[in-house]
Structures are given as C-alpha cells and as structure tokens.
UniProtKB/Swiss-Prot annotation:
Positions annotated with a glycan in the UniProt record: N78, N239, N261, N369
Tissues of expression: Expressed in kidney, liver and small intestine. Also more weakly expressed in pancreas.
Enzymatic reactions: alpha,alpha-trehalose + H2O = alpha-D-glucose + beta-D-glucose
Annotated catalytic residues: D321, E514
Alphabetized Gene3D superfamilies for the sequence: 1.50.10.10
Residue ranges listed under propeptide: 557-583
Cellular component terms (Gene Ontology): extracellular exosome; membrane; plasma membrane; side of membrane
Entry protein name: Trehalase
Residue numbers binding substrate: R168, W175, D176, N212, R221, S222, Q223, R286, P287, E288, G319, E529
Organism taxonomic ancestry: Eukaryota, Metazoa, Chordata, Craniata, Vertebrata
Function field: Intestinal trehalase is probably involved in the hydrolysis of ingested trehalose.
Oligomeric form and interacting partners: Homodimer; disulfide-linked.
Length: 583
C-alpha cells in the first residue's frame, strides 16, 4: 500500500534526524479532496465560510474529467482563476454537501426504553424522552452511489447506517461514537450499535486502523482508540459472544496499529518504558481546515511548515483539536504555530490502551485462548508500570502528560489527568482520595456548570472556559467507581451540575451542544476553528448515562452551591447520620 510505504520511509528519515526538512506524503491520494492545485485554489479563495464544506461536496462527474477541466481553466488564467469563475466551476462540477447521505430511522428505535422509568424528576424524564427521539434525527445511511462510484465522494463507504454527531459533522467520528453507543444501548438499540461496530471493524480490516472520521482526508490519522471498549459495552448489554469470536483478531489488529506506529520509549530510573503518543507523519494542510493551516504556516520559516501541519494532524488525532496541552513547553505556547502534540505522552491515550489490553485479556479468556489472554495481561502490566513511573505524581495525586523533549511532566490541570481512574488502570488503592484532593487543590469543584477542560484561557476550544461531555464522564465515572463514599458523592454532585447545565440550555434553546461555557452560566461554548455545533451525539449519550445512573436523585431545580470541602461535608452529613441509625 503506497501510504504505508511512505510512512515506513518517513520513520527511517526521522530516525536519521531528517524530519522537518523532508516532504511528507499527503493525507490521501485524491488530488481533489486531499492535495493539489484544485484544492489549494478553491480553499484559498474562501468560497465558503467553512473549509470543510468544499471537501465534503460530491463530484458530479468522474474525478479525471474534473481535474482535466480544472487544469485547462487554470492554465488559461495563469494558475490563478478569478473567484467568480472558480465559483462557477465548483457549482458545475460538484454537488451540494450531504447529497450522498440520506436520513435513517433506526429499525430498533422504540418509544419508551426502560431506563426512562428510573428517572424520578418528571421534567428530566420528559427531557430524556426528547433526547431519545434525537437518535432518529441523527441517523444516517449512505446512498448506493457511494459504493458504486467511491471516487466521486470524500465519504468513506460504510455498509451499515450510523449515528452522526450533528451540525457540520455529518459523517461518523471515531471516539465520539463510544459515548453515542453508550447512549444507544440505554435506548435499547443494540442492533444499531452492532452495525456501527461492524463499520469500524471493516475499516480496520481495510486500513489497519479506525480513521479519525468517515472522510478520505481523515484516513491517515486516527482518534483515541476506544474500539475495544465499544465492543465491551456491546457485550455487556447483549452477551453476543459469537460477534466477539468473529472479530477478536480485528480488535487485536487495531491495537497493533498503535503499537507499531505510535509507540515511544521513555528512559527513567535506569529503565526503558514503552508508552504511546499521537503522531501523524503526513504533510500538507488539513483539507477540512486548509486556509487556516496555510495562513498559520505562513508565520513560520518554509522549512518548518510540513512539521507544523503534521503536528496539527496529531492534535486532531488526539480528539483535543486544539488545546494548551499541545502548546505548553514549546517556543510559542500562546500560538497554534507552536503546536507539538507528538512531543508529549498523553495520560488519556495510555489509560485507554491500558483498559483495552485488560479487556483483550478478558475477551481471550472468555474465548478459551489462554496464551493470548496471557499476552495482553502482560502488556497491561507493563503499561501500568510505565504509567506509575512516568506519568503518576504521588505528591500531587494525579497523572500528567510527559514531555519527551523537556523530560518532565506537564503539571497543568486537565480532566484527562484522571483518566486512569476511569479506566481502572492504577495500583494505589488510595488513588480516589488523592484525586479528590487534586480536584479541590485546583478549585475544580467550585465550577457550578461543569468541569472546565483546562484552566488556561487560550481561545482554543479544548481549554477554559469550555466543558465537554466526555471529560465530565471521565471524572464522574472515575470517582463513582471508587469505594470511597466521599468520592461517590462528589461524582453525584458533578453529575447534578452537568445535568442542570444541559437541561437549562435545552430549555432555553431546544438544542444540545458539543460544548458548554462554565464561565457564562453554562451557555453553549465557543472558541476554536468553527462555530459551536448542535446535535449532539456524545453530549446526548453522556446525559443519558448520568440520568440512568442517578435518575432517582437528579433534579431539574436550581443550581447547587459550590462543591468546596465545607459544602461537601454539609451535603454528606445527612446521609452519613442516616447510615448510623438502626433500621
């Protein structure tokens, strides 16, 4: 496969210290959707407010004909087609965005899933019912032409229908789908989940990994590896061991991708530890953000531009596109031009892989393959040791991203610093108590509208003041699973705050959003490269999960007080006194 050959060559060059000066391969081979003069002229003309719109538009005719016509037109205008004629060319040769998809109502959707009956508050129960209805609005299936003429689409064909995030995101996304599936399973839509899982497994069989999303321009980057965790959620609800048996080797293949292509060695205390990072050695601007990437690169020397574009893609692969996480420690921590994603070993990525390795061991044991079960048990043990040595900080009581260049931890606050608690990847039985102190020390419990993504105000969307649903889940579920009563109560109060934020905004705007602003009364968030999006797949999924877990206690009323230690003690006191009474 040409892309794989390019990557192997690039890894060799990087090993020889030739990285930033070498031309990197493009995101995909398409000279329309991924690289080339046509893409450059259209995107730099800014025909559309959002660069993603153009690269999502299907072709009206074969790509060879489109390119030939464009080449002739460009030559006639000295390779600079006037805007009006460029617009006319696009109008003639491309279809409107979204033409390749059609609405889909899942066959397994039902009116009243059981979990709704667990919600005591009538307003919250009605709201949950409305969110359950949204699965029909977010359902999509591909038209047959995507299969018969794939060269005319940037969309990657998937056999089974799926749920999309919403807004500008009309295709599937990898890590979003984990929380979407959690919500779908509560809605008793296991067949929909199975189809989405099969789509991802098919992609692994074809490409060796799950791409960032369902477009060809996403092919060479992935997202946080949650496929094995998705399979576990599905199995927990269905006990479909036959499906696991059919696909266990494909799950292993995906983990192999991360081992072979995203592994780094960290030397500490006389030992070498293998951990993973986000790393996308492919050049050129991101097609879906082309003009922004070109303009950002124009601020750098020409020899540094390819490296910048590769780091931007790695940031997109992280799911946190973009954040101070990937800027801190570099020469320009206040600008996206200083992004250095691949220079950091992320806590959350390694916690996800740690849990995946534990699940793979359990899966193989379930299937009677003891040798493979042992293999993954050893891998998990090795990763746990690496997490404990390289990322864990005993004094602070949290894990931190490790800077490969500075050879030190990034001690800034991010909810991802507690992902090992969520993933069950720790060995210290007192870790939940330390995590609570860490949250208190950073005054995170004083935020009434959700846990902020960081305490850095950079204008990036994965920073303060935005709060994102999956990060709420990482902290809340991590604390909820702890045996410590205080941790469980904080988890509930955090869940209550997040539910009220989402419910209040929905009551005002009749919409769910991808992110919320904790500094502005929990209103829809902002910042980043595009306007805040409605929908919204994983936000809906997390809300349904919290309503399922705490439905008998959650209320739609006024906000609670800050979760300062003294307030928390007051909250806990009645339940503690009740527990002492003889019954």
């Amino acid at each position: 496969m040409p892309g794989r050959t390019w990557e192997l060559c690039l890894l060799l060059l990087l090993g020889l210290g030739l990285g930033s000066q070498e031309a990197l391969p493009p995101p995909c081979e398409s000279e329309i959707y991924c690289h080339g003069e046509l893409l450059n002229q259209v995107q730099m003309a800014k025909l559309y407010q959002d660069d993603k719109q153009f690269v999502d538009m299907p072709l009206s005719i074969a790509p060879e004909q489109v390119l030939q016509t464009f080449t002739e037109l460009s030559r006639d205008h000295n390779h600079s087609i006037p805007r009006e004629q460029l617009q006319a060319f696009v109008h003639e040769h491309f279809q409107a965005k979204g033409q390749e998809l059609q609405p889909w109502t899942p066959a397994d959707w039902k009116d009243s899933p059981q979990f709704l009956q667990k919600i005591s508050d009538a307003k919250l129960r009605a709201w949950a019912g409305q969110l359950h209805q949204l699965w029909k609005k977010l359902g999509k299936k591909m038209k047959p032409e995507v299969l018969s003429h794939p060269e005319r689409f940037s969309l990657i064909y998937s056999e089974h229908p799926f749920i999309v995030p919403g807004g500008r995101f009309v295709e599937f996304y990898y890590w979003d789908s984990y929380w979407v599936m959690e919500g779908l399973l509560l809605s008793e839509m296991a067949e929909t989940v199975k189809g989405m899982l099969q789509n991802f497994l098919d992609l692994v069989k074809t490409y060796g990994h799950v791409p960032n999303g369902g477009r060809v321009y996403y092919l060479q980057r992935s997202q946080p590896p949650l496929l094995t965790l998705m399979m576990d959620c599905y199995l927990t609800h269905t006990n479909d061991t036959a499906f696991l048996q059919e696909n266990i080797e494909t799950l292993a293949l995906e983990l192999d991708f991360w081992t072979k292509n995203r592994t780094v060695s960290v030397s500490l205390e006389g030992k070498n530890y293998l951990l993973n990072r986000y790393y996308v050695p492919y050049g050129g601007p991101r097609p879906e953000s082309y003009s922004k990437d070109v303009e950002l690169a124009d601020t750098l020397p020409e020899g540094d531009r390819e490296a910048l574009w590769a780091e931007l893609k790695a940031g997109a692969e992280s799911g946190w596109d973009f954040s101070s996480r990937w800027l801190i420690g570099g020469p320009n921590p206040n600008s996206l031009s200083g992004i250095r994603t691949s220079k950091l070993v992320p806590v959350d990525l390694n916690a996800f892989l740690c849990q995946a390795e534990e699940l793979m061991s359990n899966f193989y044991s379930r299937l009677g393959n003891d040798s493979q079960a042992t293999k993954y048990r050893i891998l998990r043990s090795q990763r746990l040791a690496a997490l404990n040595t390289v990322l864990w900080d005993e004094q602070t009581g949290a894990w931190f991203d490790y800077d490969l260049e500075k050879k030190k931890k990034n001690r800034e606050f991010y909810p991802s610093n507690l992902t090992p608690l969520w993933a069950g990847c720790f060995s210290d039985p007192g870790v939940a108590d330390k995590a609570l102190k860490y949250l208190e020390d950073n005054r995170i419990l004083t935020y009434q509208y959700g846990i902020p993504t960081s305490l850095q105000k950079t204008g990036q969307q994965w920073d303060f003041p935005n709060a994102w649903a999956p990060l709420q889940d990482l902290v809340i579920r991590g604390l909820a699973k702890a045996p410590l009563r205080r941790a469980q109560e904080v988890a509930f109060q955090l869940a209550q705050n997040w539910i009220r934020t989402n419910f209040d905004v929905y009551s005002q705007k009749s919409a769910m959003y991808e992110k919320y602003d904790v500094s502005n009364g929990g209103q829809p968030g902002g910042g980043g490269e595009y306007e805040v999006q409605e929908g919204f797949g994983w936000t809906n999924g997390v809300v349904l999960m919290l309503l399922d877990r705490y439905g008998d206690r959650l209320t739609s009323g006024a906000k609670l007080a800050f979760l300062e230690p003294h307030c928390l003690a007051a909250t806990l006191l009645p339940s503690l006194l009740l527990s002492l009474l003889p019954w």
